């Protein structure tokens, strides 16, 4: 759009501006805007098209990933054929084309060919047998010899496979087909492989269809013919009829290749089956691309193969992956087809072995150990030549690599590639045999692009014996590409890349001394991931040279070796080639196994994890040197202590068996994870850990979740078992990580290193992934390519490696035992970390969530650091959150098959960063599900019952559990910790409340909290004695967060609870609770005060279980609590009914100052008893709840009537520290005697009430004394200062982890109290109501005491206003029943008849709020004013409390204040 001319014209008119200029300018502007709009639409349309195309590509890529993964994990059904299958059937179309040429032959030629074919068939299928028949009975008679042709038994040469499912079939890698004679087996294996490969090799079939046909015929001949010599002769004639002369040569060559390969495999290589099976397996898994290209290359490589027959035979399988590239290039299409059959033959063998037979792998490994050295030696010579081409290969990667690969791969590369292909198929778990790894790699070849890079890497891995050295340089370049490809493209690719990097390190180990620079360069050029893999290649080469040590590791512990090999990889990269060789020998197999561990075998996966843990330790040794240098900046002592401690600890801390595994295995996984992690890290530094976890998890999705969890839990436990590492990390991390964890989001490298270490050590929910990420990060540190990533990875590596060492070990029990011995506290986080492992389900979200989690985590870390004096908890909590969130997101993928909904839950929960929904609870619920964790919590009253993981620090680590556990660590820190905790739970609740399912999980967390709340009070009992002031401080600090918290619980109530609460609370008057809730919803302030009052009530309810259930809270929540507390409730209800009836009678008799005085001492006693009770509650909540709690609560509830005036005063006194207005209230409060008595209660209550609030609220949630009757004051106070009581309630509740549950109860309790509690005071209200009518001013205070009861019982006040006498009499029974119903309602059952009374009267009470307006003018105005105060404080945060304070002193003021509160109440309603 050219507007320059128009602009020039307009500018020219500027001096003489006219309306025409305006019009021109407007037109120009319109043109510009239209042009912008058009361009914007076009751009947006292009963007939409691009987005669509990206989505399409993503879907296609996901489909490819799914198919590849199904192949890798063996989920795809592969038919094992016992009968021979001719490739001719597959090649029919081409043969038909050729057939038209055949008819040209003359009849003579046809007849001759017919005879030849018949003779050939006859010779092939029949054998001459000479039978001597004596002419006569005479021995001397002439003997006539007759030659008979007897049909050959095709299975004379071809062995029948073992019966499927038999021990031999399971133990033998080739199911009994491979040990047979070479000729027959070659043919047979060819046929099998051809069938499997043809299925997957359409291209090769098409290309060399004629060759395949002839070849197939020959193959059938060879299989049928007893002697292999016949086959070649037969083959040549067959070739002539085939008409393809070029292919006959190829065919002849393929057979020699087959012979060289097959024979070596059968003879030398059969001893080293690991190599040959890998070649077989890759074809089976990815038959066409890998198998055909491999053979194509072998045909071209035959001369090289001849140079080293063993190496060629072993290498030909390895070369197959390169042929994938070759196949893309399709340099030798006819040869490919012919060579395919040979590979195909191998493939079926692998198919039989597949990943299923670890025992086979170990046996084969033993065999290979004996024979691989020779094969490795011969390939080494060829490899040196091939190495440069391989280097080229990585660069060219797909099309170009083809020709170089042919040259390079002629001998060794095949084997290496096959191995590389195999490891993805059978993840490292199969450390025992290398061929298992090769099998795993076989699956990988299907990903042709990935396979290319992987093949290069794999070449180093599998060719390590033959071609490790030369592949080192070349593989390093390919790895970066593959990793980037894998990282970008597929998680599977990431797996492959992780495996491939491992392959590289082995070569490097062979070349480690000559090519140390290669490691450094590769590390720098490519991510450290690649450098570590390069170390592995050295290990492989060493393995080839000294397979004994490698296989010894395999023989001892295949899994261990896998990790050990990884260790070796990591070590050579990082520090000294000298060290790496030692571990390299151990690790070579291990590296592949670790690959398999991640991908294929669930069982293997479980063990590999343990091995990964081990690996991490060895990684620490070599990497420790590099890491120590870098970490020394962060924490020199940490890394050194951890490294030394880990090395020693690995062996010592773990079981005797573990140490061996640790020494060798950890490096393998470290390299794998590093490779994956590095890839991810390159993309997503901080999130790399999460991503890595995802990729591994993705591969392990097929794996059993239990195994994953167990392995992760093991990881968690083991880092702790290596307490030296954890302890060293923790003390340092406690300081650094607490400070740095807060900063960690900003500086992920350094602070993440410390923090992730704790995170990973403490939270191994993503142990494998995080460990891998940390490992990869550490490697990058060595590489220095990504310094940012490296920095965090260093610390993380040290910590994660420690974590990995322990976590990867399969024996979870051992790990737990070790951790238990080392640090019982750590075990709990480990348990929690298990759930976390499950959590990070979402593959992509975890990185973002991880970073986003870092912020909540940081805030939580800050809170935790303040909260938990135990520093270990601090690192764990952020780590748990990040890990749990990532894991929850990844968890969906891991368990996507089984619980996609849950995974979504976890993802959402993880993203929300809810502490209450933290992995520990979710997973505890999943594993333990409902009863195991919940009953334990209430019964023991400690977090430990929830789950061993939840017990110590882990519970504190998790937001929901932290409320429990954080309090336990230290009472002194409790106030600050609770404040932080409150903020965290608020965030969590806000995030979680929107989702019903999150609420559902919150309810579980609430039940856990309810159980844990009681334990929290223990601390308060400790705090209760010294710090009433401290508690007030806590409340002050927490006031704002507390207000927020109540709202979130209200939301939860609203979400699923509203209906349930209404019905449960008020079967008769469901409308009343709804109104109350509407009010709550209408004003968050009121909701908060109600929540605070309710939380106070709930605190007692949680302590006594009666109140909580009485609210008619969600039944499922109550059920969860009922599991533990169910035993308590019945006794509590009855005890409460009886005690409260007595208290009502006493209160009714003692309405005057005596009642108030008695109430105040009772309050003190109740407080003291409650204080005493909390400790018993911790020990046995049932006892306290059954009797002491019941008695205390009635007493407390009784005293409050007297204290009501006092309770307002009391709350001020408690608020005293906050408001300092208590003395004025007390002076004004109850004119003469009442104020002193109220003073007693207040003076006592500040101390005792603080204890009550700390002990009762925390322990028993305040045992109703303060909470129930002080609710109105607390409401007012809480609104003014988010009342001390509320703060205490929230502190105690939060610390007790009742925040959500109690909050949910809070709204309900508010309803119940406003209804039920109003009913209970009715007797006193009825008696006093008559008096208040006559004596408004003096008894306002007395009544305010009783009226506070009236406040709780608004209905009675109404009744009293209308019928004072009757109200007195009926209300008492009603009150008892009502209150008992209150207790009952507090308990889940609303069934009790009194509950019905409640609804009726509470409904009146709701109406009574309106009636209270009249009553305010009437004699019971004081009680109504008090009731107004109760609700009104919610409405008026600041203004109301003074009004309430003033109202108590004078009758006139209460009426006025009553009017205002009523107006507020009406407004709310």
Curated annotation (Swiss-Prot):
Residues 370-385, 574-585, 709-728, 735-745, 938-956, 1091-1109 have a biased composition (Polar residues). Residues 197-206, 387-399, 626-649, 671-687, 971-990, 1031-1042, 1077-1089, 1159-1170 have a biased composition (Basic and acidic residues). A motif (LFa 8) lies at residues 698-709. Residues 519-528 have a biased composition (Acidic residues). A motif (LFa 6) lies at residues 595-605. Keywords: Phosphoprotein. Residues 1118-1136 have a biased composition (Basic residues). A motif (LFa 5) lies at residues 550-563. GO terms for molecular function: phosphatidylinositol phosphate binding; retromer complex binding. GO terms for cellular component: cytosol; early endosome; nucleoplasm; WASH complex. Residues 276-293, 306-316, 1417-1426, 1434-1452 have a biased composition (Low complexity). Acts at least in part as component of the WASH complex which may regulate wash nucleation-promoting factor (NPF) activity and is required for its membrane targeting during endosomal sorting. Component of the WASH complex. This is WASH complex subunit 2. It comes from Drosophila melanogaster. The gene is FAM21.
């Amino acid at each position: 759009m050219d507007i320059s001319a128009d602009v020039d014209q307009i500018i020219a008119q500027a001096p003489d501006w006219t309306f025409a200029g305006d019009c021109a300018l407007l037109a120009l502007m319109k043109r510009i805007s239209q042009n912008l709009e058009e361009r914007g639409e076009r751009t947006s349309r292009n963007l939409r098209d691009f987005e669509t195309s990206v989505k399409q590509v993503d879907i296609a890529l996901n489909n490819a990933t799914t198919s590849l993964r199904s192949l890798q994990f063996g989920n795809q059904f592969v038919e094992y054929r016992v009968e021979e299958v001719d490739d001719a059937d597959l090649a029919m179309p081409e043969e038909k084309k050729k057939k038209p040429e055949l008819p040209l032959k003359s009849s003579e030629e046809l007849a001759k060919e017919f005879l030849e074919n018949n003779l050939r068939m006859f010779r092939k299928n029949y054998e001459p047998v000479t039978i001597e028949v004596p002419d006569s009975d005479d021995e001397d008679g002439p003997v006539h010899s007759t030659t008979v042709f007897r049909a050959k038994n095709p299975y004379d040469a071809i062995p029948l496979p073992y019966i499927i499912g038999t021990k031999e079939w399971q133990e033998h890698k080739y199911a009994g087909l491979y040990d047979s004679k070479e000729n027959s087996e070659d043919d047979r294996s060819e046929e099998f492989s051809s069938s499997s490969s043809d299925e997957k090799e359409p291209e090769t079939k098409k290309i060399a269809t004629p060759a395949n046909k002839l070849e197939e015929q020959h193959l059938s001949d060879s299989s049928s013919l007893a002697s292999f010599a016949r086959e070649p002769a037969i083959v040549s004639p067959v070739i002539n009829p085939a008409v393809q002369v070029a292919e006959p040569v190829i065919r002849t060559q393929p057979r020699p290749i087959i012979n060289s390969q097959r024979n070596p495999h059968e003879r030398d290589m059969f001893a080293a089956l690991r190599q040959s099976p890998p070649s077989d397996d890759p074809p089976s898994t990815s038959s066409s691309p890998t198998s055909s290209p491999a053979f194509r290359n072998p045909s071209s490589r035959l001369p090289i193969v001849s140079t080293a027959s063993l190496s060629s035979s072993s290498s030909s399988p390895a070369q197959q992956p390169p042929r994938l590239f070759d196949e893309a290039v399709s340099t030798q299409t006819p040869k490919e087809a012919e060579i395919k059959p040979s590979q195909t033959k191998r493939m079926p063998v692998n198919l039989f072995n597949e990943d299923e037979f670890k025992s086979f792998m170990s046996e084969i490994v033993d065999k290979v150990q004996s024979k691989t050295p020779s094969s490795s030696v011969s390939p080494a010579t060829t490899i040196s030549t091939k190495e440069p081409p391989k280097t080229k290969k990585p660069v060219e990667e797909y099309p170009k690599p083809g020709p170089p690969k042919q040259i390079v791969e002629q001998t060794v590369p095949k084997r290496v590639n096959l191995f590389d292909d195999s490891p993805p198929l059978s993840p490292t778990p199969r450390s025992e045999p290398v061929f298992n790894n090769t099998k795993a790699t076989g699956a990988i070849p299907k990903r042709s692009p990935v396979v290319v890079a992987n093949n290069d890497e794999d070449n180093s891995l599998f060719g390590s014996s033959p071609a490790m050295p030369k592949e080192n340089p070349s593989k390093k370049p390919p790895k970066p590409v593959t990793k980037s490809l894998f990282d970008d493209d597929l998680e599977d690719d990431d797996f492959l890349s992780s495996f491939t990097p491992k392959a590289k390190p082995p070569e490097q180990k062979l070349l480690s001394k000559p090519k140390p620079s290669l490691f450094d360069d590769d590390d720098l050029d490519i991510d450290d991931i690649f450098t570590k893999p390069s170390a592995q290649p050295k290990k492989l080469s060493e393995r080839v040279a000294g397979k004994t040590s490698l296989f010894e590791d395999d023989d001892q512990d295949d899994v261990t070796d896998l990790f050990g090999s990884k260790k070796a990889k990591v070590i050579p990269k990082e520090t000294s080639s000298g060290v790496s060789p030692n571990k390299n020998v151990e690790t070579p197999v291990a590296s592949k196994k670790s690959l398999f561990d991640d991908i294929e075998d669930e069982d293997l996966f479980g063990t590999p994890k343990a091995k990964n843990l081990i690996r991490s330790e060895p990684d620490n040794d070599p990497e420790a040197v590099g890491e120590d240098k870098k970490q020394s900046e962060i924490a020199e002592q940490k890394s050194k202590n951890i490294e030394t401690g880990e090395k020693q600890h690995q062996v010592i801390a773990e079981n005797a068996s573990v140490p061996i595994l640790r020494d060798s295995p950890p490096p393998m996984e470290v390299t794998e994870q590093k490779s994956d992690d590095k890839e991810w890290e390159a993309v997503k530094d901080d999130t790399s850990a999460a991503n890595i976890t995802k990729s591994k998890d993705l591969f392990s999705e097929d794996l059993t979740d239990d195994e994953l969890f167990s392995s992760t839990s093991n990881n968690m436990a083991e880092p702790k078992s290596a307490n030296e590492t954890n302890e060293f990390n923790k003390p340092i991390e406690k300081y650094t990580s607490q400070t740095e964890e807060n900063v960690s989001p900003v500086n992920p490298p350094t602070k993440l290193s410390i923090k992730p270490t704790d995170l990973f050590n403490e939270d191994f929910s993503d142990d494998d992934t995080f460990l891998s990420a940390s490992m990869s990060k550490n490697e990058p540190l060595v590489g220095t390519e990504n310094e940012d990533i490296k920095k965090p990875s260093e610390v993380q590596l040290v910590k994660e490696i420690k974590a990995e060492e322990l976590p990867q070990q399969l024996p979870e029990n051992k790990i737990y035992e070790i951790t238990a011995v080392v640090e019982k506290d750590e075990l709990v986080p480990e348990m929690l970390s298990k759930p976390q492992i499950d959590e990070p389900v979402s593959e992509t979200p975890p990185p973002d969530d991880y970073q986003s989690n870092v912020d909540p985590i940081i805030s939580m870390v800050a809170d935790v650091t303040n909260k938990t004096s135990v520093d270990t908890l601090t690192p764990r909590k952020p780590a748990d959150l990040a890990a749990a969130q990532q894991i929850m997101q990844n968890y969906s993928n891991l368990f996507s098959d089984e619980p996609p909904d849950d995974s979504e839950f976890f993802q959402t929960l993880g993203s929300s960063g809810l502490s209450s929904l933290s992995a520990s609870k979710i997973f505890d619920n999943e594993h333990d599900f409902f009863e195991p964790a919940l009953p334990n919590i209430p019964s023991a009253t400690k977090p430990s019952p929830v789950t061993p993981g939840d017990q110590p620090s882990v519970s504190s680590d998790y937001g929901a559990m932290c409320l429990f556990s954080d309090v336990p660590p230290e009472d002194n820190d409790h106030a600050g910790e609770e404040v932080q905790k409150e903020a965290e739970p608020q965030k969590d609740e806000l995030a979680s409340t929107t989702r019903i399912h999150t609420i559902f999980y919150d309810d579980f967390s609430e039940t856990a909290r309810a159980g844990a709340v009681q334990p929290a009070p223990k601390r308060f009992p400790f705090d209760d004695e010294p710090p009433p002031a401290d508690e007030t401080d806590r409340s002050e600090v927490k006031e704002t967060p507390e207000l927020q918290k109540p709202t979130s619980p209200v939301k939860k109530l609203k979400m699923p609870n509203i209906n349930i609460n209404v019905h449960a609370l008020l079967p008769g008057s469901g409308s009343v609770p709804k109104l109350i809730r509407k009010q709550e919803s209408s004003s968050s302030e009121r909701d908060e005060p109600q929540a605070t009052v309710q939380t106070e009530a709930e605190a007692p309810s949680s302590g006594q279980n009666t109140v909580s259930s009485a609210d008619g809270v969600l039944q499922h929540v109550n059920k969860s609590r009922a599991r533990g507390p169910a035993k308590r409730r019945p006794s509590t209800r009855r005890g409460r009914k009886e005690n409260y009836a007595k208290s009502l009678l006493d209160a009714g008799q003692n309405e005057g100052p005596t009642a108030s005085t008695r109430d105040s001492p009772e309050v003190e006693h109740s407080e003291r008893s409650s204080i005493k009770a909390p400790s018993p509650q911790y020990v046995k909540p049932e006892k306290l709840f059954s009797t002491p709690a019941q008695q205390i609560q009635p007493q407390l509830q009784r005293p409050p009537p007297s204290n009501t005036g006092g309770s307002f005063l009391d709350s001020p006194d408690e608020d005293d520290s906050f408001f300092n207005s208590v003395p004025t209230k007390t002076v004004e409060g109850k004119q003469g005697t009442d104020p002193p008595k109220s003073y007693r209660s207040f003076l006592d209550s500040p101390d005792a009430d603080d204890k009550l609030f700390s002990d009762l609220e925390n322990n028993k949630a305040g045992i109703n004394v303060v909470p129930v009757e002080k609710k109105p004051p607390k409401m007012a106070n809480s609104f003014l200062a988010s009342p001390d009581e509320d703060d205490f309630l929230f502190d105690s509740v939060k610390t007790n982890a009742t925040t959500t549950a109690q909050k949910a109860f809070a709204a309900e309790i508010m309803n119940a109290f406003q209804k039920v509690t109003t009913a209970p005071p009715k007797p006193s209200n009825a008696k006093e109501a008559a008096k208040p009518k006559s004596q408004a001013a003096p008894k306002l205070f007395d009544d305010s005491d009783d009226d506070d009861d009236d406040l709780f019982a608004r209905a009675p006040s109404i009744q009293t206003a209308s019928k004072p006498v009757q109200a007195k009499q009926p209300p008492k029974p009603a009150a008892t029943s009502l209150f008992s119903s209150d207790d009952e309602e507090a308990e889940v059952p609303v069934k009790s008849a009194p509950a019905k009374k409640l609804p009726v009267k509470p409904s009146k009470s709701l109406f009574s709020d309106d009636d209270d307006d009249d009553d305010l003018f009437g004699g019971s105005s004081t009680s109504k004013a008090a009731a107004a105060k109760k609700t009104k404080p919610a409405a008026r945060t600041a203004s109301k409390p003074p009004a309430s304070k003033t109202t108590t002193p004078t009758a006139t003021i209460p009426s006025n204040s009553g009017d205002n509160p009523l107006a507020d109440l009406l407004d709310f309603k």
